[in-house]
A protein has these predicted regions:
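Bacterial N-terminal signal peptides that target proteins for export
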Residues: 2-12
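Aromatic- and glycine-rich peptidoglycan recognition patches
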Residues: 2-3, 23-45, 120-186
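C-terminal motif of bacterial Sec signal peptides marking the signal peptidase cleavage site
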Residues: 18-21
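Post-signal-peptide N-terminal segment of Sec-exported extracytoplasmic proteins
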Residues: 28-32, 36-75
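Extracytoplasmic/periplasmic, Sec-exported soluble proteins
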Residues: 42-46, 66-74, 99-106, 136-140, ...
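Catalytic cysteine-centered active-site loop
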Residues: 58-110, 115-129
């Protein structure tokens, strides 16, 4: 096989893979029964303040030790969000984990904080090694995010502040628990 043929074959393979990735799933079948509208969600004043603060931080860049929308890390995000609701939290993930009331995974509500050991292994080695190294110690917590509902949570990772799903394998296997900080629930 000459070099030109190999390059042409490689380019064709890449193009085929890209086109296959663009193909969408077929549309879902129509529903046989009408769907009832969702009941309106009533939020407490603290939850309204939390929703507003979430908007401020959405898409913020990652900055180790940061606590502002200009740059924030995971525990700084949680501390800053709760500060805007009038609730003072400690600064570190470990201290935040110890401060809240435990919540079962099936009882999660908007505003609860979820904890993981996903980034524990990166200490002293840089955050980008997290994707290739094994998880941290079973009992250690070193990453957290705020639960939004519907299995989603917002967190600050090395890629910035964004929303992930709890049922994604990386988060499911590194999940260590949740805490509630609003007095009397949310």
């Amino acid at each position: 096989m000459d070099a030109t043929y190999r390059r042409l074959l490689g380019a064709a393979l890449v193009a085929a893979l890209l086109l296959a990735g663009c193909a969408g799933a077929p549309p879902p079948p129509p529903l046989s029964e009408p769907v009832a509208p969702l009941a309106p969600v009533t939020r407490s004043p603290r939850e309204v303040a939390l929703e507003r603060a979430l908007g401020e931080f959405s898409g913020a860049p990652y900055r180790s030790g940061g606590t502002t929308p200009d740059g924030v890390d995971c525990s700084g995000l949680i501390q800053a969000l709760y500060q805007r609701t009038g609730v003072r939290l400690p600064r570190t993930v470990t201290d935040q984990y110890q401060a809240g009331a435990p919540v079962g995974v099936n009882d999660l509500r908007f505003g609860d904080v979820v904890f993981f050991n996903r980034y524990c292994q990166t200490r002293g080695r840089g955050p980008y090694l997290a994707s290739i190294l094994s998880l941290g110690d079973e009992d250690e917590v070193c990453h957290n995010g705020i639960y939004l509902g519907g299995g989603r949570f917002m967190h600050a990772s090395p890629r910035g502040v964004f929303i992930s799903r709890l049922d994604a394998e990386v988060w499911r296997v590194s999940y260590r628990g949740a805490r509630r900080y609003f007095p009397g629930g949310n």
